């Protein structure tokens, strides 16, 4: 799905979907390359430190660059597998190793405080429909696998609509 393979299949057989096109999925699955692309458009992103498996790194340098708290995540993984929120520099190395269990590249990104929202858009027969904005409220520390797939989050449409019209 997130690699673009499932989206590509749906596109080929003409089934509408609310996920990104297969090309966009492929672009965004490599988080490091996607952030470089976004930065090339002069858009702001979280501060980032990229590590390849086997590369030497210094946790103090990483913490200084991105700050604490921060997120450690596999570069090419979906569904929040391998992601950790790190609130103590002493845990950074362990969480980097945890993320490496999902792949050969890891990103450490600065924590951005705020609300998380989702907006679906669907095109059917050339007609674009924008679905309602929803705020994601995780019962966990962040929007992790359990929050996404095991019901440990709430989507709050009414609150987002109130904020948007207020």
Positions of PLM-derived features:
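Short glycine-/acidic-enriched loop or helix-start segments at secondary-structure transitions
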Residues: 2-6, 81-82, 118
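Short small-residue beta-strand/loop micro-motif enriched in glycine and branched aliphatics
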Residues: 18-20, 79-80, 157-158
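A short, GP-enriched loop/loop-strand-helix hinge that lies immediately N-terminal to
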Residues: 1-29, 44-47
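Phosphate-binding site of ATP-dependent enzymes
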Residues: 87-165
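Active-site nucleotide/adenylate-binding loops and adjacent lid/helix of ATP-dependent enzymes
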Residues: 27-115, 126
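Short hydrophobic/aromatic-rich motifs at helix boundaries and adjacent loops
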Residues: 5-9, 66-68, 149-151
